[in-house]
């Protein structure tokens, strides 16, 4: 059934504190917008500056993010970039294990999300490696066992909107109304997750995934509408093509555009989590926006 939206109720919004139960039983409360730092233990992610493929590079990346004040680390061992090399489950697990060992040597308190669409990878990352959150770009569509695993390990789940898979997702950009259709599709999945007993869910509109340039900015403009789910909202636009195509530059030059969108997402859209390559810049955005909000 299509979602009925009263647009007047959601013209703008602000950050709402939220809590999540971690697999180890901890209840973690987040009182301000969170900065999620990207750790790609891959050789072929779209932004070269995010690639940390050997132990020394991973060590340096983790140390830098921690020094810059990262709140959550998002580790991925399989690039979702179109055209990326296929990676076996065994290789993805090997990469993640290497990265998780280094992360947990540096910190045991900061939550770690594992960026994977494979249920067995998610299970082992949570139950054996010490990850806390499952970040699934497919929303459960690429592995039918994913939600069963998330329920069994009692992990918070990032539900992202995407149609198809990273190779063919741009073949599925036909929407009657992009925001309403994305909301409706996410709403259907939320109902299924609720039936399975999965409660701690973060919503990701899926910027850049099965959306055209114009559709990405329509979603950004309509971000307040995503609060109808009363869930934390993750925004992942860091150095993506929705920035580089509009500004005619490259991902290496995408920090200014990323900062602009993150500011809009926080100030106008009430974003809960910013997923970024550049932790220090995002922390500054959060600090400025929070100071502005709380000023008399």
Residue ranges and their predicted role:
Residues 60-76:
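Catalytic domains of carbohydrate-active enzymes, especially glycoside hydrolases
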Residues 36, 70, 111, 131-132, ...:
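Hydrophobic "anchor" residues on beta-strands that sit immediately upstream
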Residues 6-15, 20-24, 30, 45-64, ...:
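Active-site-adjacent loop and "lid" segments of alpha/beta metabolic enzymes
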């Amino acid at each position: 059934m299509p979602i009925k939206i009263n647009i007047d109720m959601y013209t703008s919004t602000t950050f709402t504190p939220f809590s999540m139960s971690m697999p180890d039983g901890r209840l973690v409360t987040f009182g301000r917008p969170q900065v999620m730092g990207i750790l790609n233990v891959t050789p072929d992610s779209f932004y070269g500056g995010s690639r940390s493929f050997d132990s020394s590079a991973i060590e340096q990346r983790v140390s830098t993010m921690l020094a810059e004040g990262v709140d959550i680390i998002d580790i991925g061992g399989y690039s979702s970039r179109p055209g990326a090399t296929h990676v076996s489950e065994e290789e993805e697990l090997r990469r993640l294990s290497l990265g998780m060992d280094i992360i947990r040597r540096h910190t045991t308190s900061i939550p770690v999300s594992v960026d994977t669409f494979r249920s067995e990878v998610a299970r082992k990352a949570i139950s054996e490696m010490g990850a806390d959150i499952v970040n699934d770009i497919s929303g459960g569509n690429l592995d039918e066992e994913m939600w069963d695993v998330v329920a069994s390990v009692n992990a918070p789940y990032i539900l992202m909107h995407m149609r198809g898979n990273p190779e063919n997702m741009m073949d599925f950009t036909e929407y009657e109304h992009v925001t309403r259709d994305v909301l409706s599709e996410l709403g259907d999945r939320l109902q299924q997750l609720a039936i399975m007993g999965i409660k701690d869910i973060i919503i990701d509109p899926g910027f850049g995934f099965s959306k055209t340039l114009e559709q990405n900015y329509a979603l950004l403009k309509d971000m307040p509408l995503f609060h109808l789910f009363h869930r934390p909202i993750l925004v992942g636009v860091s150095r993506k093509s929705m920035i580089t195509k509009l500004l005619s530059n490259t991902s290496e030059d995408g920090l200014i555009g990323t900062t602009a969108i993150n500011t809009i997402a926080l100030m106008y859209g009430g974003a809960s989590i910013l997923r970024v390559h550049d932790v220090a810049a995002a922390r500054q955005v959060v600090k400025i926006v929070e100071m502005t909000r709380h000023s008399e």
